[in-house]
Amino acid sequence: MVLIKVLANLLVLQLSYAQKSSELVVGGDECNINEHPFLVALYTSASSTIHCAGALINREWVLTAAHCDRRNIRIKLGMHSKNIRNEDEQIRVPRGKYFCLNTKFPNGLDKDIMLIRLRRPVTYSTHIAPVSLPSRSRGVGSRCRIMGWGKISTTEDTYPDVPHCTNIFIVKHKWCEPLYPWVPADSRTLCAGILKGGRDTCHGDSGGPLICNGEMHGIVAGGSEPCGQHLKPAVYTKVFDYNNWIQSIIAGNRTVTCPP
């Protein structure tokens, strides 16, 4: 694979995400204000609307989905309520963006990962702290947590003032393969959700973290429409498979290749 630093937005990639262009947590409740210091909100200078989420992994780097890229993107850290500001909230802009170019599957949707270097490092505080990258892969049955400011209703365009959280489980990949043609069996993705339905990421949650045992194991990539349907779990980029790529980019190695 070839590593490229993309300065233009990924228009084709974005248009391909009809299922969950940006997602929110359906079937969840308001997150505890202190449980998501790593959660960031992505928006643009032209709009205050949150179109995606992401996660802070150190003072200078944020991990999110490639299809969340926009021109003039802004990253807000330390936020809980959209309307009541935390004293330690900070806003940053990108210094650089890094992607994996997918040559095996032209639409690139099975490598939905973007690493953003911030123009200025953040200051850690009560509501701003990094999440750990995965130390090992998590298997089927692992309980994980999803969170975001995304849509909370499957029938109405209802978006919360505060992030919502809920627990889901990693399920067998076979549940996702027939639902999403861009998720082949050998893709580096996780399939996760509640098979009976009712709990899911949704529009506005894309790019946000899948947290398992305190580590970021997934990035919200895509799913069904409407969200939270019976036997229709969602797809998450498998962060563990990109650990070496992420650490190499952070260390300054711009020639590192993405996992095949």
Swiss-Prot record:
Highest taxon, organism lineage: Eukaryota
Residues annotated as the enzyme's active site: 67, 112, 206
Primary location group: secreted
One Pfam entry name: Trypsin
Compartments it resides in: Secreted
Tissue spec. comment: Expressed by the venom gland.
SMART domains in the record: Tryp_SPc (SM00020)
Glycan attachment positions: 253
Signal peptide: 1-18
GO biological process, one term: proteolysis
Listed Gene3D superfamilies: Trypsin-like serine proteases (2.40.10.10)
InterPro entries from the UniProt entry: Peptidase_S1_PA, Peptidase_S1_PA_chymotrypsin, Peptidase_S1A, Trypsin_dom, TRYPSIN_HIS, TRYPSIN_SER
Keyword Flavoprotein: no
Keyword Hydrolase on entry: yes
Family: Belongs to the peptidase S1 family. Snake venom subfamily.
Function field: Venom serine protease that selectively activates factor V (F5) in a calcium-independent manner. It cleaves the Arg(1545)-Ser(1546) linkage in the human factor V molecule. Induces the coagulation of mammalian plasma.
Protein name as it appears in the record: Factor V activator RVV-V gamma
Organism name: Daboia siamensis
The organism's taxonomic lineage, starting at the top: Eukaryota, Metazoa, Chordata, Craniata, Vertebrata
